[in-house]
Amino acid sequence: PSKWMYIDHGQGAVETEPIAIRFGLPLEKTYSYDPKSPKIPENLRHHVLGAQCNMWTEYAVTPEYTEYLLYPRMLALAELDWTPKEKKDYNSFTRRLDNQLIRLDMHHINYHIPMPEGPMADRIAYTENTTLTFHNSRNYPMVYTTDGSDPQTSSTKYENPLHINKDVTVKIATMLPSGKLSPVRSIEVVREKLMPATEKSTQPGIELRRTEGNLYFVKDLDGAHWSAPKVVKDFEFKPDIEDKGAYCYTGYFEVPADGIY
């Protein structure tokens, strides 16, 4: 079932993970799968010999990224296959997993480490002050810097939300018990002034343009050929042609009070 066992799906939030077909399938979700589903009649469950995970590689284009998606969820698959449901214990599994990760290091396997999540973007704009709050999916400690350098094991440990009132770049990483760090997440925090309001005579609707092609990154839009604009009544996402491309909407919205929208 894809909700548990399609491990080509990203293991964390979309804003922290490399490109994948879907996101939000953490280790705990895979571990929680029960091969002997209650939907199977009890007198037939003994026919279930195990489970499998699916690993599609449309987006996993290198061996290193394939390993990143496979591990450690493949270890969760192994345990859920041989462990009776009543003896499954995710907390016990993750404690033992920390030792297994060291073994994976010895074999140079590029496994996933939970990334610092929380902020929905890697550039945060504010007017007076702002607060950044972080967490990760396995409650590992995190370390961070605000001087532009990459965090090390000796860097400041994240313990409370970060209150910010000046321009700064926050770099933060998750730290395993072994001292190994996750990839660094870098967030630019910028104090900005509000844009002046635009007074313009408007009509109902939004201007829509479309471009075709396989577009995975914003930079892929450079040099794109856009269709002639048309006015639509709302944000419609039903494509006129095969759904490979991007939409660009242009319009105005009413701002009732000063703020960041």
Stretch-by-stretch model annotation:
Residues P84, K88, T94-R210, L215-G251:
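Short, compositionally stereotyped local motifs that mark structural "simplifiers"
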Residues K244-A246, E254-Y261:
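Extended extracellular/luminal ectodomain segments enriched in beta-structured repeat modules
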Residues A13-E15, L27, P151, S182, ...:
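Polar low-complexity intrinsically disordered regions enriched in Ser/Thr and small residues
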Residues P1-M142, Y249:
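Substrate-binding groove of N-acetylhexosamine-processing glycoside hydrolases
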Residues R45, P161-L162, G259:
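Bulky hydrophobic/aromatic packing residues
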